[in-house]
């Protein structure tokens, strides 16, 4: 029994609401869930909360591309995220969204307190402006070369390669992500958070034990470079919360995102009146708050976040725990290799408990990257969980049921039981310190001992002799009791298996009951609890991940399989039947304005045999075009796709209406037509050069 009950609030970083969860994401949620489940198993009051990070430029852009409201898009993504987490047995106490009334009020509260305490500065800045779209370009509207490490193709707020943060104006060779134009400078009024005012507090906090040593050392480098005032403003258009008393100005997503932890807990408090928000977040709180994050967002969580909390009168977290990235088969996750695996694709093929165990077996308290080697994954799960753990019960339970009325014997020799129980503090310390890999090794070493005991005793031989029936009863009862202890130790990692084992033993598995005497206790008939990992299922998962390359959030509909098949059967020598036209000069070609367009709507045209009516978004303007592709496409195949159109073709009045351009397609005609589909990174309105 825990000596005293702790009050704990634990969070995982908020997944961004513009796409699906993948196995790289799942590392963090499994890591946090194991820690939360362990705390609850020890009898502590632990609340595990999370939310979707639902604001910012990327979400606004994607919603525009899909032709739907941002609110509708994030609601759908939230639903998908929650289902993925639930199916991986991640047990949040509350899952919310940063686009909520609780979060709006909390963000405004913290901002106003910072402002009133003198930590918000206002000044006019020169910001990048898109001359073609007549709009300011916030961070994610701009891409260019990182000013720190010189990595190309980086966003305007932080570098994915080196983790540095900067303003969009610092980018080298910036380009508008909206139009592709080179931006110009224009003045605008912005609000800044005075981060340098908290340097002393932050230096003390970062060396207080709140961070891993690797993180604290990295922060020392940033302190040496000097802290900068932090721009917390974004100009309209922006999907987020408007700043109080500042029409047309919005909170930068990284201001209200971590506040989402507080907003989600506020939402939980409303559902559970016995919970007190101030008891966990008040300045003098004695409760514990822990954040689990990826190493790519250390800067925000270890500098901006504690400073914002301190400056607005709230408590700082006890610790921020960072983890590394996930690689697959020793390399970065790859769509072309099928190793960029979505959570849902994994769930379609494999048991989530497999991955929970594999991640646990390789996790430590350090910030090292974790490699998901798919061959090792199958071998380890089969060896540890099936061959060692579950096999311990499957080899012995049948004898108890068939020969001893399903009742366990009183164990006379408790030497093994005592040895297993003696490891509970070691295993507990490993869970507490997030050294899950060490905990798994301790548990599997015990499983080896238990299996060796059964193999040496050979109860299947004992039961053949009348004078060894009681000895067989003792061996099998002892083995099952050891199995119960092992699964109790593993309950935070394997909750579904633990549930099955609880049904088998017909009693709950609790840490306090590890030493429970089960003499005379009746068990249920044994049922298979875990199947081996079959490599053909792993390979099918990888194959499906390759197929998923054709299904992106930007283009949710793909061509029908029969069209794809036809594409490979078209003549390999099209130039024979359709030779290249006469040469033109460059000036003639330059007159043609080709633009990326998104097909917002497609519909049949009454009394037209060949035409479909298309509504095309070309980036702030909608065009109506009649296209002769009815023989090759149905309207539902087209909606949401990107294509290429001739944007400066003179409008043509047809008897069905005005056609304001032309979409481009390839093929001999009839059903053998394929509209041009640009790379998913292209945006409506971009010029094709």
Swiss-Prot record:
Name of the protein in question: Methionine--tRNA ligase
InterPro entries xrefs: aa-tRNA-synth_I_CS (IPR001412), Anticodon_Met (IPR041872), Met-tRNA-synth_bsu_C (IPR004495), Met-tRNA_ligase_1 (IPR023458), Met-tRNA_synth (IPR014758), Methionyl/Leucyl_tRNA_Synth (IPR015413), MetRS_core (IPR033911), MetRS_Zn (IPR029038)
Segments crossing the lipid bilayer: none
Domain tRNA-binding stretches: 588-689
Any one of the GO CC terms: cytosol
Binding site for Zn(2+): 146, 149, 159, 162
Gene3D superfamilies, per database record: HUPs, Isoleucyl-tRNA Synthetase, Domain 1, Methionyl-tRNA synthetase, Zn-domain, Nucleic acid-binding proteins
PANTHER family: METHIONINE--TRNA LIGASE (PTHR45765), METHIONINE--TRNA LIGASE, CYTOPLASMIC (PTHR45765:SF1)
Native species: Shewanella baltica (strain OS195)
Binding of ATP, residues: 335
Any one GO molecular function term: metal ion binding
Reactions it catalyzes: tRNA(Met) + L-methionine + ATP = L-methionyl-tRNA(Met) + AMP + diphosphate
A GO BP annotation: methionyl-tRNA aminoacylation
Cofactor(s) needed: Zn(2+)
Keyword set, alphabetical order: Aminoacyl-tRNA synthetase, ATP-binding, Cytoplasm, Ligase, Metal-binding, Nucleotide-binding, Protein biosynthesis, RNA-binding, tRNA-binding, Zinc
